[in-house]
Amino acid sequence: MNSKKTGVIILGCIAFLHIACSGDKKTQAQDTSDSMLEKSSAISEKPNIIFYLADDQDVYDYGCYGNEKVHTPAVDALAKDGILFTNAFTAQAICAPSRSQLFTGKYPLKNGCFANHTGTRSDIKSVTTHMKKLGYEVVLAGKSHVKPENVYQWDREWEPVPKQGVPRDYIPLDSIAAYLKNAKKPFCMFITSKYPHGKYFDVEHPKASDIKFYPFNENKKTDKTFIKTKAGYYRSIEEDNTQLEEVLKLVDTYLTDNTLFIYSADHGVSGKFTVKDIGLKVPFVARWPKVIKPGSTSNQLIHYTDVLPTFMEIAGGKFPEDMDGNSFLPLLQGKDVEVNNYVYGVRTNQNILNSEIFPSRMIRDKRYKYIRNFNSIEVVEQNLTGKPNVNYFIERGAKAHKNEPFEELYDLQNDPFEQHNLASNPDYKSIKEKLIKDMFSWMKAQGDILSENMIGIPIITPKGNRGFKLDQDTPRRKIPEARKNTLTKDDYIVIEHW
């Protein structure tokens, strides 16, 4: 395989300038064309592509990923009929930034959407541009949460629809059915569910034995509130599975075998807003009859930024060099080849309901993972400025995350749930130093606002009065009266395109 660039930012279609530190980007043209010829009977015509994206669901909460307590028969059946990926990632465990990667093939720092409720840069080309040029109709059916419209120009777009007796709107099944029945040209459709994202179902009298616990939440076994919330979440997962079942019935009724169907979820809920694997690792299952071997598994690192390059190659095109992602088409075709040697993660923690100043960056290969928390208690003093009002919010952010150290290093082979920090262990010094070097090289190539030797800590905001300001109350955090409205425009880095 001519793999494109090997570096990628951690981790449902798609999120880099040339990244020198991550390895050479290759074109994938010649070897992939050979593999395409091998599969010519299956993809001699452009296949239809459907990407189903759930909302806020842990990779650990599926039957096919080992949780026998949750009911996910439709996803489990897809895995049985296709391929299950064990190392698929998004770069940000939050809605808009995660989706922006799928749709652009670029990490959030490069595409501009690196905080929630913000927009992609207006000069970015998305899936709607790239796939249209390759002869596809590009459709969004369900939740969007991406902007601006000039970047995301869907050929057809249908909003979620209200449904009685359930906590969230449904995907637009009637519109999907009518479209699939009458489709005249190849299409790329994103079906974006609002499940299982809260508000969850109200489950009466749940028991701890109904829930599967993991090292990151086993201390909650006697927490009645947690158990009730988790039971409602499991029930919401079932409701999403019901919608997925209906979609698959429509696909099997109206479409040929020449249809690639991918299921994923935008990020985990247990690690939401973090760069831990419980937030960034995502479920990723694909079915493509006559191309994907049923019941197969891949342990290769793939990333949401790889989705658009893959779709473009399947459609007969070439993906541009400034995309961060690589095509994983060879994996779908049964070849065990490396797509990425790294994936990366971003944590902003500003412009959200619980806004605090606590940015993080992460780099991960198949075994080791390094995290830098730039405003930890350990280093907060060096982040302070000559402005008392700014310093209050810098210190507040560090205290809000007082249990998160400046550096984290994990051996994921022996510690998959990141319970034992090895950052200060001298036996891992060389591993840590290499990861640090490569992470900061990647950050520089991405145009990150953070750097290794920066002075202070950036405070970011959308222009004007929009967004969740650090010095104003939100529904989830209160600011002392004396600190309200004390920050000025000059205290912030204003992100103009937000």
Curated annotation (Swiss-Prot):
Ca(2+) binds at D55, D56, C95, D266, H267. It comes from the Bacteria. Keywords: Calcium, Hydrolase, Metal-binding, Periplasm, Signal. It holds the Pfam family Sulfatase. Residues 1-22 form the signal peptide. The keyword Signal applies. Its EC number is 3.1.6.-. The conversion to 3-oxoalanine (also known as C-formylglycine, FGly), of a serine or cysteine residue in prokaryotes and of a cysteine residue in eukaryotes, is critical for catalytic activity. This post-translational modification is severely defective in multiple sulfatase deficiency (MSD). Induction: By rhamnose. The keyword Signal applies. Coiled coil: none annotated. GO terms for cellular component: periplasmic space. The active site is at C95 (nucleophile). InterPro entries: Alkaline_phosphatase_core_sf, GAG_Ulvan_Degrading_Sulfatases, Sulfatase_CS, Sulfatase_N. Binds 1 Ca(2+) ion per subunit. It is an enzyme of class 3 (hydrolase). GO terms for molecular function: hydrolase activity; metal ion binding. Its cofactor is Ca(2+). Belongs to the sulfatase family. Sulfatase involved in ulvan degradation. Ulvan is the main polysaccharide component of the Ulvales (green seaweed) cell wall. It is composed of disaccharide building blocks comprising 3-sulfated rhamnose (Rha3S) linked to D-glucuronic acid (GlcA), L-iduronic acid (IduA), or D-xylose (Xyl). This is Ulvan-active sulfatase. It comes from Formosa agariphila (strain DSM 15362 / KCTC 12365 / LMG 23005 / KMM 3901 / M-2Alg 35-1).
